[in-house]
Amino acid sequence: NIKKSLILQGYYFSNVTSSIKTNDNNTVNIIFNIDLGEKSKVSIIEFTGDKFFKDKTLRNIITTEENKFWKFLSGKKYLNQQNLSLDERLLRQFYLNNGYYDVSVNTSTATILDDDSFKLTYNINAGNLFTVNSTKLDLPIDYNPLNFTKVEKLLNKLEGNKYSFNKISKIVKEIDRISLSREFDFINASILEEK
């Protein structure tokens, strides 16, 4: 458990040993010797697969950074499992917001380069570029459509453009805002996406 905890903090090359010392009063002391070593740094970040974007663009999306001499204060250059999970989510969101509805970002792999550094590889399958063909707002008959003109305009702007999760989320938030301001109790904003 100690080793796992150290790895989560970026000490992949740490060494933990234990020893037991027997005392005169029928008790024992358990002694853990921990050599942290250096924190593991990311020397190279690469992206493979059908990514459709340059590596430089994708590096600007993720939080993990390559170790460079001018980044001596940055904590983002260290290999960290939580950051890797965040990076995968950020890459997925980036692709979803750029029209790649079926994107998959496969688990990143870290390859040991030397005593304290790794090469980090993200495998991306962007899939096809999706555009929005048509949009439609279905309202109950007792709702005034004039209350939803802004939503209609936002929906119309989507048509013919690349699919964007952020833009769709903004529309749902606008519907929620209208329902709160107009005190509509039973609005259920849902998006039906068809391929």
Question: For the regions a protein language model found, what residue spans apply to each?
Answer:
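Periplasmic polypeptide-binding modules associated with outer-membrane biogenesis and secretion
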Residues: 1-195
